[in-house]
C-alpha cells in the first residue's frame, strides 16, 4: 500500500503517469499539512495572518509488492520538477494485510 502526500498542482501529472504504468485505482483526498515547508504569511484587509497548514493531496494506492518500486519511481518522476524542492511531498509504504472486493467477495491480489 502506498500513501503519497503531494502538491495539488501535481495531481493530474501523477494520475496520468500512473495510468501509463497501468495503475488505475487511486483514492485522492484533499488534506492540509506542513513539514519542513512550514506555512507562510498572508495579508488580509491590512492584517497579517500566518497560514500554518498548506493544501496537499493524499493519494492511497493499493498495489502488489512487485509494483511498489515502479509506482514510487513514477510518483517521484511526476512530482520532482526542476531538481526538487522542499514541499514536493512524501511517499509512505506499508504492508497491505488483506483486500476484499465487496461486490464479488474476491480477496488478495484478485481484489486489486
Predicted region positions:
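Positively charged, small/polar-rich N-terminal and surface patches that mediate targeting and assembly
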Residues: 1-112
